[in-house]
Amino acid sequence: MAVTAAQVKELREKTGAGIMDAKRALVETDGNMEAAAELLREKGIAKAAKKADRVAAEGLTGIAVNGNVAAIVELNSETDFVAKNDQFVALVKETAELIASKKPATNEEALALETASGITLEAELVQATATIGEKITFRRFAVIEKTDAQHFGAYQHNGGKIGVVSVVEGADETLAKQVSMHIAAMNPTVLSADELDSEFVKAELAQMNHKIDEDNASRVLVNKPELPHHEFGSKSQLTEEVLAAAKASFEEELKAEGKPEKIWDKILPGKMAKFIVDNTKVDQQFALLAQLYIMDDSKTVEAFLESKGAKAIAFTRFEVGEGIEKAETDFAAEVEAAKAGL
């Protein structure tokens, strides 16, 4: 039977298939719309299966807020070009909204959710893989909840390559969003330095001091003074005994310099503050509250928020592709393989 343009248009709107794929499906099923849609679905699963072993490390984050619930998701594609595709962008948005609405606990639960199309999210991804032509995957999500007294800071950077949701108490959405902008830029991994494992701190401190050794090797060559090692890396290592010893050392310095004791109280706080800053570098790299705030680097994030009567409660930061090992493509080898008919 002859297939009309109206039938092709209807099937494309229903399935997202290309013009020729829709037309062929209608021809094969004698114009039966439901059968044609099922045929396209089956072909889509087959196409998706062929792409299953490909690495999808590009993509976008998506954020949706539904009252006191926010969701952040990451969907991946194989190329950045597809990540900018309107269908992919819409799929990311729909997925974030679905997660915020249904609050699944696991990826398995999320993939089983019914979408606006009446099919599961998993089926929607298979369909997208078939119609877009690249492997599309749902990698991860987080559901974040707050109270009425708290605010979400939702922020996406670089077109959605980085997504952040923060929860801030005692502030408005503007300040909460600024905190999320800081998180996007500075990439903290924990809220407070108290969350950093002691062995992790030791390992990071050793790496920092190794970097100082490398820098010092270069500085010696140009007759620059060597930089000192950091003795400590975290506030958790600055015990009362350590701080007392540092204070005593500074007092000895002031005494040796001939500074009268009556002015020591004006000098010591500054020296102690610098000692703490110099010996909490691991905290400053990984803990949000210990980092210098990018909007006012005279204060830590914690101190800045306190000055505004606010407090950071939690945050989640996704960066597209982090932790995914991308396949390295040797273009010359691909050309040679094509020539050889491999």
From Swiss-Prot:
InterPro entries in alphabetical order: EF-Ts_dimer_sf (IPR036402), Transl_elong_EFTs/EF1B (IPR001816), Transl_elong_EFTs/EF1B_dimer (IPR014039), Transl_elong_Ts_CS (IPR018101), UBA-like_sf (IPR009060)
Region (Involved in Mg(2+) ion dislocation from EF-Tu) location: 79-82
Keywords associated with the record: Cytoplasm, Elongation factor, Protein biosynthesis
Location within or outside the cell: Cytoplasm
Domain of life: Bacteria
Any Pfam family matching the protein: EF_TS
Major localisation: cytoplasm
GO-annotated cellular components: cell surface; cytoplasm
Gene Ontology MF term list: mannan binding; translation elongation factor activity
Keyword Cytoplasm in annotation: yes
Entry keyword Chaperone: no
HAMAP family xref list: EF_Ts
Function: Associates with the EF-Tu.GDP complex and induces the exchange of GDP to GTP. It remains bound to the aminoacyl-tRNA.EF-Tu.GTP complex up to the GTP hydrolysis stage on the ribosome.
Entry's family note: Belongs to the EF-Ts family.
Record's protein name: Elongation factor Ts
Organism annotation: Lactococcus lactis subsp. lactis (strain IL1403) (Streptococcus lactis)
Gene responsible for this protein: tsf
